[in-house]
A protein has these predicted regions:
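Phosphate/dinucleotide-binding and metal-coordinating scaffold of catalytic cores
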Residues: 1-102
Length: 102
């Protein structure tokens, strides 16, 4: 199991958990009252459960030459979206950043 903190405008908003490469969970912090991660992931008390890597996070990953460079330099498997997100998570476009919990 791997975990990451999800920040919105620098405030911890949620936790992303990879149970295995086919099972993911996104839990908002119980006292979080700020903006949602995205329109498709509004703030709620119950966790979101996914049977694949969450689309929002897949959508912020690099593509093309940038992806190939990331995979090569960080020695990441192309199918390991969680590791890709951890590699670029603090430098995403927009208000969301992601940092691995070690």
């Amino acid at each position: 199991m791997r975990k990451a903190e999800v920040f919105i405008n620098g405030i911890k908003a949620a936790e992303l958990i990879e149970h295995d490469r086919k099972s993911y969970e996104l839990k908002y912090e119980k006292d979080y009252q700020g903006s949602a991660i995205s329109l498709t992931l509004p703030v709620k008390k119950k966790p979101y459960i996914f049977n694949q890597f969450p689309c929002f996070f897949e959508g912020v990953l690099p593509e093309g030459m940038m992806l190939e460079s990331l995979l090569r330099t960080k020695k990441i498997d192309k199918a390991d979206y969680f590791s890709q997100l951890m590699a670029v998570g603090m430098d995403l476009v927009g208000h969301v950043t992601v940092e691995e919990i070690k």
